């Protein structure tokens, strides 16, 4: 079964390396770079989702999707619109709607960062702003209950910005399992790759 791991906006596909290295050998795990999927199209959320749908269309069997932060949002959007193509869903530190106050603060901070500071992020400075602005009104509150596949909701104990959303998903997605990872912040795949690998391995083993 093909698994696709999607990174967050502040990181790149390589952020999954340590987690994947500690999962069972032979696991078919893809980790696309979200910016590369756009192929120079305008950095908007609808374009990103369309590009990801094209990427997923290459697979003949249902997919196991796992995403962190922005990656979780993209995975969730795909699962809602292509339910027949998704076997399972893992959402890590994923917001169920864009928090307006936090978004405004993040934009303020980003505005004063030099372009060079974005080199290790998923998108450059201009695309980060463009993508963020296209997601201002994003809200999955009314559709979370439509997710019908087995779903695992994960959130770091110290990721206070997303704990409420994790609990929302756990309460509203019918087949959701929920786990808070102790002592960990937002970037779970880099802060606790071994622990995350164990959790994911157990989740996927239960599906087989």
Predicted regions: what is each one?
Residues 116-140, 157-158:
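Hydrophobic, aromatic-rich cap/lid helix
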Residues 146-147, 153-155:
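Short beta-strand/loop motif that positions the catalytic acidic residue
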Residues 17-21, 28-64, 198:
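Active-site loop/oxyanion-hole signature of alpha/beta-hydrolase fold enzymes
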Residues 10-18:
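Serine-hydrolase catalytic-loop signature spanning alpha/beta hydrolases and amidase-signature enzymes
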Residues 184-193:
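Catalytic histidine-centered segment of alpha/beta-hydrolase-like enzymes
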Residues 160-165:
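Conserved alpha/beta-hydrolase "acid-adjacent" motif
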Residues 45, 76, 80-81, 89-115:
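Flexible "cap/lid" loop of the alpha/beta hydrolase fold
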């Amino acid at each position: 079964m093909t698994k696709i791991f999607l990174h967050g906006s502040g990181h790149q596909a390589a952020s999954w390396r340590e987690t994947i290295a500690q999962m069972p050998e032979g696991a078919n795990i893809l980790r696309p770079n979200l910016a590369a999927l756009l192929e120079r199209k305008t950095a908007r959320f609808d374009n990103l989702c369309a590009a990801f749908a094209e990427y997923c269309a290459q697979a003949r069997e249902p997919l196991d999707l796992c995403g962190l932060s922005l990656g979780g949002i993209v995975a969730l959007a795909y699962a809602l619109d292509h339910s027949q193509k998704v076997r399972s869903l893992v959402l890590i530190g994923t917001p169920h709607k864009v928090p307006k106050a936090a978004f405004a603060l993040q934009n303020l901070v980003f505005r004063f960062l030099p372009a060079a500071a974005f080199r290790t992020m998923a998108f450059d400075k201009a695309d980060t702003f463009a993508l963020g602005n296209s997601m201002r009104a994003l809200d999955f509150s009314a559709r979370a209950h439509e997710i019908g596949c087995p779903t695992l909701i994960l959130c770091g104990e110290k990721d206070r910005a997303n704990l409420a959303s994790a609990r929302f998903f756990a309460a509203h997605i019918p087949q959701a399992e929920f786990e808070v990872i102790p002592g960990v912040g937002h970037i779970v795949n880099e802060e606790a790759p071994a622990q995350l690998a164990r959790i994911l391995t157990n989740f996927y083993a239960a599906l087989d």
